């Protein structure tokens, strides 16, 4: 058994979609989350910057909380920095893209999968490579939608304007045919996008499977915990009093969203500051 917590990192609020899934599947595991809102979006940034920022978040959680595993709850960071994280850290590091690809494969019935994500994730072809590795017969189409990240971070999810932007961005694209068939599966290749899932589902055909990789990523995390005999001691059930949620951005807005999204009012939320050496409280 291992009573240390699990770390989660993202460029902003999106990683909380993965945390919410973790609270369902791994209810006894402590959560330490960093959302780097001050430097989001990561999508248009150079790879070297994404790697630097991602390593800074990981370094903070390891040194501050001695985490036993790191869940990269960010597709862009997974696409651009996963090998560097695994080389740097001596703990398991779980990325989201392999999970999303597997979930997409499991969902499709006609082998036509569409993926939406940030500019960086799409250009990296990380999803394409993972999907093709799983099934070379797939038809795969990708679209970069950085505006969806801004919708979430600007608190426009669920608003009429937000619904309009989502519909206009994906409806016609999802209706297009390739090899005579429309895609029956849409993978949400950015952890911000599940916050817009209702709007996305409303913009596509009712038979399209809208896939959130979070569930599969946490399943993979749980499997690693099982193999390493690293679950929290079940005799001392964790009620999350020690959980901490950090942001480098606006703590008021971050606090409001985090409490609402996780449906928890009594959370420890702290602000992180950025300096030349990395992140500090």
Curated annotation (Swiss-Prot):
It is an enzyme of class 5 (isomerase). It catalyses: L-glutamate = D-glutamate. The keyword Isomerase applies. Coiled coil: none annotated. One of its GO terms (biological process) is regulation of cell shape. GO terms for molecular function: glutamate racemase activity. InterPro entries: Asp/Glu/hydantoin_racemase (IPR015942), Asp/Glu_race (IPR001920), Asp/Glu_racemase_AS_1 (IPR018187), Asp/Glu_racemase_AS_2 (IPR033134), Glu_race (IPR004391). Keywords: Cell shape, Cell wall biogenesis/degradation, Isomerase, Peptidoglycan synthesis. Pfam families: Asp_Glu_race. Provides the (R)-glutamate required for cell wall biosynthesis. PANTHER family: GLUTAMATE RACEMASE (PTHR21198:SF2). Belongs to the aspartate/glutamate racemases family. This is Glutamate racemase. It comes from Oenococcus oeni (strain ATCC BAA-331 / PSU-1). The lineage of its organism: Bacteria, Bacillati, Bacillota, Bacilli, Lactobacillales. The gene is murI.
